[in-house]
């Protein structure tokens, strides 16, 4: 028996809005504890992890582990047809994931499961010394400010602030955020703005957002649901200063 019911489909929609812009195909693993996926883009630049606990769902029935191989673009087309006040139900039949959205009207879609030889990438274990809480709205606006002058951005952290900075051909930009954390060391790295914008498509997943960074190390963005019922995280490889 497989049946998942969620009264807030926006959690799925915002997750896969970001995920579908990063990877073409995913394998969603579901068992009695919850739903999870781990994926990396073809260029091995961005890694994504999604985990939704069993307790998040209104109804959660999964009597044996199941793997759902899906085309993310096709899944996102369907999720876009949901409304925030719909109730979403996930079931399966032979070769299909069935999504039902019920509100003022009832909509049912079947998304074909695909054949996928998939080696689930293991989640990188990076020993960060710096983890900074930052409202995702502030991060998004900072990136919008920076991208008018450059296609890459440097993140720099010291004991007082997080600084986002870019130097362009015709203009420069610097955004400073007082993080209020106890930071004992400095860190700096450069990242592609286009990749950060893909990650920030998930901004509505949660307001509980953190950044981890190290010098010339990947940037990790964490979005956590309340009560630890869900986590969406992205790990972005840095750009080297000498890269064109």
From Swiss-Prot:
Pfam families: PCNA_N. Disulfide bonds: none annotated. The keyword DNA-binding applies. Gene3D superfamilies: 3.70.10.10. InterPro entries: DNA_clamp_sf, Pr_cel_nuc_antig, Pr_cel_nuc_antig_CS, Pr_cel_nuc_antig_N. GO terms for molecular function: DNA binding; DNA polymerase processivity factor activity. Keywords: DNA replication, DNA-binding. GO terms for biological process: leading strand elongation; regulation of DNA replication. Homotrimer. The subunits circularize to form a toroid; DNA passes through its center. Replication factor C (RFC) is required to load the toroid on the DNA. NCBIfam families: pcna, PRK01115.1-5. Sliding clamp subunit that acts as a moving platform for DNA processing. Responsible for tethering the catalytic subunit of DNA polymerase and other proteins to DNA during high-speed replication. Belongs to the PCNA family. PANTHER family: PROLIFERATING CELL NUCLEAR ANTIGEN. This is DNA polymerase sliding clamp. It comes from Methanosphaera stadtmanae (strain ATCC 43021 / DSM 3091 / JCM 11832 / MCB-3).
